[in-house]
From Swiss-Prot:
The chain crosses the membrane at residues 268-288. The lineage of its organism: Eukaryota, Metazoa, Chordata, Craniata, Vertebrata. Transcriptional activator that may play a role in the unfolded protein response. Binds to the UPR element (UPRE) but not to CRE element. Preferentially binds DNA with to the consensus sequence 5'-T[GT]ACGT[GA][GT]-3' and has transcriptional activation activity from UPRE. Binds to NF-kappa-B site and has transcriptional activation activity from NF-kappa-B-containing regulatory elements. Increases the binding of CREM isoform Delta with CRE. The CREM isoform Delta-CREB3L4 heterodimer functions through CRE but not through UPRE and may recruit HIRA to CRE to regulate histone exchange. The gene is Creb3l4. Residues 191-230 are annotated as: Basic motif. It holds the Pfam family bZIP_1. It comes from Rattus norvegicus (Rat). The keyword Nucleus applies. It is a single-pass type II membrane protein. Residues 289-367 are lumenal. Residues 1-267 are cytoplasmic. This is Cyclic AMP-responsive element-binding protein 3-like protein 4.
Amino acid sequence: MELGCPELLEPPEDIFSTGSFLELGFNGPPSKVPGLQKSESDDFLNLFIDPNMIRCSETSPGSDSGVSEDPGSPAPQAPSSPALYEVVYEAGALQGTQREAGPTFGLISIQIDQWSPAFMVPGACTVSDLPSEAHRHILPRVSTIAPPPPAALLSCQRLFLTDEEKHLLGQEGVTLPSHLPLTKAEERILKKIRRKIRNKQSAQDSRRRKKEYIDGLESRVAACSEQNQKLQRKVQELERQNISLVAQVHQLQKFTAQTSSRAAQTSTCVLILLFSLALIILPSFSPFQSQPEARSEGYQLHGVISRNILTHEDMTESPESPVLKANLEELPQVPATNGSTKMAHLKMRVKARPTGPIRGMVHADEM
């Protein structure tokens, strides 16, 4: 760029307007900028800006915007240069940081009685020839604030140890510092202590689970043994009932055997009686009795000769009575008329009376 560039000679009209301040992240008018009083803000806005004092150039390699990162160190002043204000703004960086850290004024840097060859870079503007009565207010840029290193953060952190870790460290005879960072040896000791604590906790958990499992098994064994005893008592009762039932069955078998034999005997007797009655009754209903004429024609009655020997009651016993008995026993057989021989039946009845007389009767039938 050349110094006589026409667009650089004309100052931008809206550089200090309300819209430009809204772009920079300020919600209020320029009068609300810290470091400027009410009257000073009016003078600042009504200021006549000499276009010849505005120059543009490249930024210095050691700084982002030509402004020193250390706001407290003053720059070398030129003897013939008047007091000036430098207003540096970057809209892109301001919009990114406004959302995170809220409204900030670190993007505006105002320096009094300071002049340095400023060069115009994209996104930066330098305004010179400002009143020297303005209050000097220098704020650092947000982009210049770098995050602290991790070592600095670790140095601010405090080391927290549990009571068990402290106890184990005391047993080991090791004392750890209360703030980080730790040395390699201290880190190894701390890891070793924490590993011991984890192993101890895992062993306690395993023992607790084992104890719970054993307690569960014992409770199950107790329940099973109690149930087994109940079943044994029930089995004994069933055995006694079975024995009593077997005895009753034997008694019933004996009783049924006796009743069956008695029934067989009774039935046998009844059958014999009925058969006898049938033999007695059936001949009277013989079919031959219905023909009396035929029987009378084919069969004729014949007379029977019988002899009776009578004795008197007053007759004494004769001496020939034994001889008579012998003769009667030796009677010969008499042949019958139909050619069949029959024995003569002699019956003698001798009745002895208390008086001594004997009655004898000989009966002979001949057919």
